[in-house]
Amino acid sequence: MRLTAKQVIWLKVCLHLAGLLPFLWLVWAINHGGLGADPVKDIQHFTGRTALKFLLAALLITPLARYAKQPLLIRTRRLLGLWCFACATLHLTSYALLELGVNNLPLLGKELITRPYLTLGIISWVILLALAFTSTQSMQRKLGKHWQQLHNFVYLVAILAPIHYLWSVKIISPQPLIYAGLAVLLLALRYKKLLSLFNRLRKQAHNKLSL
């Protein structure tokens, strides 16, 4: 039985409510001592992990819709992507304001360049910013065929973000490895598309070098 448009709307409502839960928990934890000995790091890691969860959920939608034969499920992908961007923005903001501090914000650019894991993080965030800004139907119509080309960069984020997480922790624990493994699995489900994209980029690069 396929989902109806009305059921998808209710599913979106449920997903938005689910998206609010991590923020509500974080507010509660901050106000009731629910964080650890280093609350700043806890906030950074929590927002970063939540962004990764939404990213992985968004990547899961397409194969899930295909295998479950639920085409309308695709309509939930955008809101998951926007929640991912919101969490990633909080993640970046918590680093800039809570760890560096307002007085040290001029150092942010230097930090992003000199620390490789931060470089991967900011590249991922910039891509997510572009995807969020162009996620509307009006932007899709305006960009035409270039819209899909731009949104294919989500696969690059799926590679860079788990590496950013792995690189940022001092001691490798199972958690970042699990996220990395899930990202690899979801990318493997799209291997045909990724292989096609790779071959197209290689062909374009070859043509440019031949000029």
UniProtKB/Swiss-Prot annotation:
Q: Which family does it belong to?
A: Belongs to the MsrQ family.
Subcellular location per UniProt equals:
Cell inner membrane
Give the quaternary structure.
Heterodimer of a catalytic subunit (MsrP) and a heme-binding subunit (MsrQ).
Query: Which gene name does the record give?
Result: msrQ
Q: Which UniProt keywords apply?
A: Cell inner membrane, Cell membrane, Electron transport, Flavoprotein, FMN, Heme, Iron, Membrane, Metal-binding, Transmembrane, Transmembrane helix, Transport
Supply one GO CC term from the record.
plasma membrane
Q: Name one Pfam family in it.
A: Ferric_reduct
What are the transmembrane regions?
Answer: 8-28, 54-74, 82-102, 116-136, 153-173, 178-198
Q: Which cofactor does it need?
A: FMN; heme b
Q: What is this protein called?
A: Protein-methionine-sulfoxide reductase heme-binding subunit MsrQ
